[in-house]
A protein has these predicted regions:
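Pre-recognition alpha-helix immediately N-terminal to the DNA-recognition helix
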Residues: 19, 26, 46-50, 111
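N-terminal helix-turn-helix DNA-binding core of bacterial DNA-binding proteins
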Residues: 29-72
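Short, hydrophobic-biased segments on the C-terminal half of alpha helices
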Residues: 62, 80-81
Length: 148
């Protein structure tokens, strides 16, 4: 009986985790398609989001962008290079430390970002209930998880 309960409980946790992953993948898939429709790779859209979300009194360094994008420093440099060639971002030396580069959106980057943000919010609105339900199920499954 206990094995049946454990397997039922484990099955419920797996189901909750799978549903959450599915809902996230659906949104991420939408994001990739929407970005490509605007002529940019999804990773460049994500880069622009990180830059735009910086606190107003700060500027985006390559190190900060790498951390927020969960990329290696050299991969972030390459991503910024591609976005700069596309006219989405501009890079300048940090006046306080000339070895550091600071990255900001260009006006073209801001236009594309604003359009994509609006599309993403419109897409996300009807999915919120599914995502919230999946998160609540995960939370409940985690709370019922036996402690190791």
């Amino acid at each position: 009986m206990r094995d049946e309960m454990n397997s039922s409980s484990e099955q419920s946790r797996l189901k909750s985790l799978a549903e959450f992953r599915f809902q996230m993948r659906k949104f991420l898939n939408f994001s990739e398609i929407a970005s490509e429709r605007c002529g940019i790779p999804a990773q460049q859209y994500q880069l622009m989001q990180v830059i735009a979300a910086m606190p107003e009194d700060q500027q985006a360094s390559i190190t900060y962008l790498a951390e927020r994008m969960i990329l290696r420093h050299n991969s972030t440099v390459e991503l910024v290079d591609r976005a700069e060639r596309a006219g989405l971002v501009a890079r300048e030396s940090d006046p306080k430390d000339m070895r550091r580069s600071l990255v900001h959106l260009t006006s073209e980057g801001e236009l594309i970002l604003n359009r994509l943000v609006a599309e993403h919010l419109s897409e996300l609105a009807p999915r919120c209930d599914h995502l919230i339900r999946a998160l609540r199920e995960l939370q409940s499954a985690g709370e019922s998880q036996p402690k190791p």
